[in-house]
Amino acid sequence: MTRPIAIRPVGAVELVAVRFHPDGARDWLGAPLSTATDGRLDIVDRLRGVRPPAGDPEAQAKAMTDRLEALRLQQGWTVDPVVRAEVEAMMDDAPAAVRSSADQRALQRRFLDRVGVSPRMLRSVLRFRRVFDHALEPTPEAGGWLEAGLGAGYFDQPQMARDFRRFLGFTATEWAREQVELARAIASQTYKPGPPHLA
């Protein structure tokens, strides 16, 4: 995902998402991942037969990973070794390799197929996620947003602010305020008695 997407459940929801490696969902989807980027997919057919147990998040996650592993083995899913190597280098925050224009365009095409976004966009997404890794560090020197941004690889605050707006739709301050409101809303619902149970 490269922009915010609202998820509004129409009923009870427990397992909300499965997170693949950036280049790992192509074979499961059965189509170029660029067709799914920032969109909504009907995955009912792909999940037919999966019955995760209600009220048990660990068992739900296991049921889903077991299903995915069975499909991987049955259908012979593969990864593109060139794309995987580039993704791993990005995840390690290694500098981008120098390529000819033709090689760069070929890599972009492979990325659109296997990852759904360009290498440059994936680098931006990973850098943005690192802001939160740095911001949530439980060390006294972790500092605030500015230090988290610098630690994640941003050169200045406006650059990070642009990514906050692009990926979350908020400034860092607005997002932090929303998280406080969300925590309060969850806490206020947590301690309310539910409706009476009918026998």
Model-identified regions with their sequence ranges:
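DNA major-groove recognition helix of helix-turn-helix
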Residues: 111, 123, 164-165, 176
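Alpha-helical bundle regulatory/interaction domains
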Residues: 1-104, 114-119, 133-155, 171-199
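Ser/Thr-glycine-rich phosphate-binding loops at phosphate-binding pockets of nucleotides
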Residues: 161, 168
